[in-house]
Amino acid sequence: MQFYELNSSRMDYRELSADDLDLLTPLLRSEETMQTLGGALSYEQTLDWLVDTLRRYQTEGCGWQLALDKPTGVPAALCGLTYEQVGAERVLTANCIVRHELRGIGVGRECIAACLLYAFESMHADEVSAFVQKDDLAGLHTAVACRMQPTEKVSHIAFGKTAPCVRCVVRNPHLAEKAEAENEPSEDKKSTET
C-alpha cells in the first residue's frame, strides 16, 4: 500500500518494503555515503532503520522513500518526510541521503524539492525543517537552494547518534500568498476609498 507519493523529473520514488534490505546497502552501509552522518550503519542498524521506516508509514502516513534513477532504475538516494520531536514541538522534516558517487549533480536538491512539494500541496504543512550536520556544506547548500533558511544550531539525533546540526526551515509559500491576498483591499473597498 502506497501511503504517499513523491514526483520529480529524474527520479522514480517508492516506499520501502521488508524486501529492500539489500537495496539499502549501497546507501546506509557505505562509509562514503554516510560520512556526514557518523559513518556506515551495521547490518543490525540498517534492519532497525528499515523497521522504523515501515512503522512510520503506518503511524505517521509518511517516511523515507527510495529514489531510483529513471533511466537505470539504480537506487540514487533515500529521501522523505518524517516527524521529529524538537523539545516540546513535533516538526515535519525533509530528509535526504544521496549515494556518494551521485553527489554534486542535483540529486539531493531534486529529492528535497519533491518532498517539499508534497508536504505543502498534499499535506498542507505550514512549514518543513531539515537538520543539516554542521560539517555538511553540500547539505546546507541543498537546503538553501530549496529556499530553506538556517534558523538555529541544535543537537539532533540521527541514526542513533547525536550531532551538532543547523536547523533549516521553509514556510509554505501557499500560506504566504494566501495571507497577502487576504491583506489586499478588495475592489469594492478600493472604489469606496476614492
Question: Which residue ranges define each predicted feature?
Answer:
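Short amphipathic alpha-helical/adjacent loop interface patches that line ligand
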Residues: L50
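A short helix-loop-beta-strand connector motif used in the catalytic cores of GNAT acetyltransferases and
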Residues: T53-L66
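Acyl-donor (CoA/ACP) binding surface of acyl/acetyltransferases
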Residues: M1-Q35, L68-T194
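Short amphipathic alpha-helix in the helical subdomain of ABC transporter nucleotide-binding domains
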Residues: Y43-T46
